[in-house]
Amino acid sequence: MNSPHLRVPQLVAIPAGPAGVDVLAAAISAAVADPALVIAPIPDVSPHVTEHLRISLISAIAPQRELTDPLVQVVLTTSGSTGNPKGVMHSLAAIAHSTRALHERLGGAGHWVCALPLHTSAGFMTVARAVLSGTTATPMSSLGGAEPFTSEAFIHAAEIALAHEGRHYISLVPQQASRLLQSARAGELLARFDAVLLGGQAIPADLIATLRDTGATPVLSYGSTE
């Protein structure tokens, strides 16, 4: 029989679409309030997430595994260079430190637009930064493969986020940024963000140049799951 004080990862099912941000934000807030809670976000099945992938992510998290490190409160999955998902453990203290360090680099805490899958490190951190900083995380309607990533979806989310006073940030993969630059209005809105974080893939030099030409402020980042 398991001990009543057994600490194991609690799976947090992230629905596709904007609702996923509220679910994840609530889970992060719960972990902040309860140091014994360990959260592990996984995506619900969607057009972009197969049941096979979901099962492999759950297997990597190993929700039946007892965690002996009292500082661990978040388990994220990464495929690394092998393509096989692995569960990587984090403390909220490390996530908070990363948040402070990034905001110091960027010029202060700000409001985030969420464009990346929320169970990934980059997507998770956009919500975590907002929760830990007391700002907002505005979801794109395409989150989690709920619908295709489009300039229109970005424009809608960006206009909501930019209505909040303060600084504004978004994290994208290069393919998304390239697609947004095909829309004049999307390009105009990107230029109003204080930083456009890029990572997750090789970043073409001409993409950086084009972003800067439009007035945007690209900041190169890398996967931070490990």
Model-predicted segments: where are they?
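Conserved AMP-binding A3 loop
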Residues: 71-100, 107
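Gly/Ser/Thr-rich phosphate-binding loop
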Residues: 182-226
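A short helix-loop-beta submotif of the ANL/AMP-binding
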Residues: 12-44, 110-111, 120, 128-142
